[in-house]
């Protein structure tokens, strides 16, 4: 099945136990330069637990965007700290994978959506996340049609 080819996996399990949590802010780390967030839909909660870090340390970040329904809220939250966001989609299948699996069970249109986030505007070939309603489809349309990010998009 699908999980036989999954090179990492997410499994949600109902539990009656408890989980201790700490916010990043609670650790009082002196300097944080870079943060990677891959939390399967809990990205906004993580960001809200690092308000002081975002305000005073302003680290660069890579955020795996799990749920398209949260893009707008995450965009708004990061913009409130003056962050710039850039699309960094990554194909799910890599023929040089650890298991040496040659079959791409995911298909050519399947991948992971990441945002690169920086206080500074980056000189990059990555496409910017242009507004709270931007999507990978809009970004791909801009690339295919060789138009700037301030041009109306097609669907």
Language model features: what each stretch is:
Residues 58-63:
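Proline-aspartate-enriched helix->loop->beta-strand connector
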Residues 2-57, 68-73:
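Short internal loop-to-helix segment that lines adenine-nucleotide cofactor pockets
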Residues 74-155:
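Binuclear metal-ion centers of metallo-dependent hydrolases, dominated by the metallo-beta-lactamase
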Residues 66-68, 91:
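Active-site beta-loop-alpha junctions enriched in small/polar residues
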